[in-house]
Amino acid sequence: DSLHVGHFMTLVLMKRLQMAGNKPIALIGGGTGMIGDPSGRSDMRSMMTNEIIDHNCECFKKQMSKFIHFGEEANDAKMRNNADWLRNLDFMEFMREVGVHFNVANMLRARAYENRMAREGGLTFFEMSYMILQGYDFYRLYKDEGCNLEFGGDDQWSNMLAGTDLIRKKTGKDDAYAMT
């Protein structure tokens, strides 16, 4: 229920972009939090209840508000929660519309999965789907909000590229970018 030092640079960048007249969109993972990011992990994350995830999301927004201004004005930051589009997703429709654009061989080469694949426990489909969901998040922000830049930690690089690739494949446009 608390941001960590790894979030600081992203928040500083969001603040600087906001000061320059841009409208930052902070995405919180009320949907992906149900799975947990396997990046940098040697074991599977424990699953949290919806109540804990929702509580954490509220805490994150409160903490982020100390850095960036949320509101309704032109360049006020906006908070989006991926639970809005992930929690009630139709699995078969999602696989037909989104899953078809992901190559498993390419996904397995991602840094986030290399160590896990080398271990005895391997990687579950549950965890592997995180990359697809994060890529879909960027696609939704691109489509719904006009967001064309995603930035995050270097441990998220493969997941962010999954988003730019999905946007290119679904829209035919090459104007979505990722930055660490």
Would you name each region that the model predicts?
Residues D1-Y177:
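NTP-dependent nucleotidyl-transfer catalytic core
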